Amino acid sequence: DYLPNGQAKMFTSDVRWAEGDQVFTDADEWEQYRLRVNHPLRIAGDRVYLQGHGYAPRFTVTWPNGESRTQMVQFRPDDPTFFLSSGVLRFDPPAGMYSDLFERRQKQLAIQGLFAPTAEFSGGEGDIMSSSFPAMRNPGVAIDVYRGNAGLDDGRGQSIYSLDPRLAHSGELQK
């Protein structure tokens, strides 16, 4: 909820959590908790605090064999006032779709782009997206889709906010 000037009234996050062997069960069976400012989740003597807020857009990719994959990843608010945010998602093809590991790696997808909770378009042809309000009044995305080696299985940690530019420069990822 937001005030008329765009200031958030309260920050909350509905989370599910598990510990011990419960992490191997279905997430629907995990404990639920509404995380709020100054009301941390307490687990095994630790406290998990809500540090900020933003959006995690949901994307679904349908592969040529009809299988689909859905991901929801937190995007980084680049504009703290109107929450224009950036992020990236990486998708591995469904198991069994490509028997050769090299071919499968070449068919990974990466989506990188912007999310605007209240999209506003400007520019000569209306092709520049920004956000004019922090609440989701007219959500929009501007994305680039890449195919190739998204680095999913190279053993290195990756940013959830941007692609490794070396993958595109080397030709491993192509728009």
Predicted regions mapped to residue ranges:
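Solvent-exposed, non-transmembrane regions of integral membrane proteins
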Residues: 1-175
